[in-house]
Amino acid sequence: MSSLLYIFLLLAVFISHRGVTTEAAVEPVKDINGKSLLTGVNYYILPVIRGRGGGLTMSNLKTETCPTSVIQDQFEVSQGLPVKFSPYDKSRTIPVSTDVNIKFSPTSIWELANFDETTKQWFISTCGVEGNPGQKTVDNWFKIDKFEKDYKIRFCPTVCNFCKVICRDVGVFVQDGKRRLALSDVPLKVMFKRAY
């Protein structure tokens, strides 16, 4: 009986220790060279699947209250514009599934725009505000999640405990020949290339 109790206790310690180790480990997002994405460093966001456009950039579509939308460049050879990532916790590296601001420049922070009644889409614009996690900035926070062997961008902010948010992947919606980023059931599979 005592040997059975000993085995049970040993198993319980092993399982609890393993669970703590797994939860404590934070996996960083990696670029195409296998290096961790760093806060404040420029990266291109590129599509993994080729043949449908290039990297991500901005376009003034003159159809919204925030005139600048995030789009996928129509030219496959284009890397788009570099972005910087700023995690809510100010960590040096960008962990997978952590709330981050994404910005093309200091004044072009990604934001989930208001619902477009005409297209029935939630588009991504660049009228957000950096930092200040909370109710007033909840639409400015995105996550980079693993998707198969690559990554996807997801809107599912957790910076506001009492805010009701939509949780969906970011994909592409084609409108008037422009490949606009919008919330979607079909995520855009992406990779990250450091801009030097």
From Swiss-Prot:
Disulfide cross-links: C156-C167
Factors inducing expression: Induced by infestation with spider mites.
KW Signal (keyword) present: yes
Places the protein is found: Endoplasmic reticulum
The keyword Signal belongs to this UniProt entry's keyword annotation: yes
Sorted UniProt keywords: Disulfide bond, Endoplasmic reticulum, Plant defense, Protease inhibitor, Serine protease inhibitor, Signal, Thiol protease inhibitor
MF-aspect GO terms: cysteine-type endopeptidase inhibitor activity; peptidase inhibitor activity; serine-type endopeptidase inhibitor activity
One GO CC term, this protein: apoplast
Pfam family, one: Kunitz_legume
InterPro entries with a match to the protein in the record: Kunitz_inhibitor_STI-like_sf, Prot_inh_Kunz-lg
Signal peptide (from-to): 1-19
GO biological process: defense response; negative regulation of peptidase activity; response to insect
Family: Belongs to the protease inhibitor I3 (leguminous Kunitz-type inhibitor) family.
Function: Can inhibit both serine proteases and cysteine proteases. May be involved in the modulation of the proteases that participate in the hydrolysis of dietary proteins in the gut of spider mites.
Protein name: Kunitz trypsin inhibitor 5
Origin species: Arabidopsis thaliana
Chain's gene name: KTI5
